[in-house]
Amino acid sequence: MELALQITLVVTSILVVLLVLLHRAKGGGLSTLFGGGVQSSLSGSTVVEKNLDRLTLFVTGIWLVSIIGVALLTKYR
């Protein structure tokens, strides 16, 4: 059980990083520091962006549950 949670944690950690990097910069914050503040002529959210947001939230939820699971298993081992 602990091994499965640890594998899930590693996989979801990598997925969260990749999914966050796939998002377009929305301006402001630290993204403008690295040139992410340039806006394209297409403003607004597309279906792809909305689905990417949903997928990111879903994977982040799994990541959070696996972190709590690993912490509880470590504490009560």
Curated annotation (Swiss-Prot):
One GO molecular-function entry: protein-transporting ATPase activity
What the entry lists under InterPro entries is as follows:
SecG
Q: Which domain of life is it from?
A: Bacteria
Can the keyword Cell membrane be found in this entry's annotation?
yes
Topology relative to the membrane: Multi-pass membrane protein
Question: Where mainly located?
Answer: membrane
Q: Which GO terms describe its cellular component?
A: plasma membrane
Instruction: State its location(s).
Output: Cell membrane
Q: Give me any GO biological process, just one.
A: protein secretion
The family annotation for this protein states: Belongs to the SecG family.
The record describes the protein's role as: Involved in protein export. Participates in an early event of protein translocation.
Q: What is this protein called?
A: Probable protein-export membrane protein SecG
Q: Which organism is it from?
A: Mycobacterium leprae (strain TN)
Gene that encodes the chain: secG
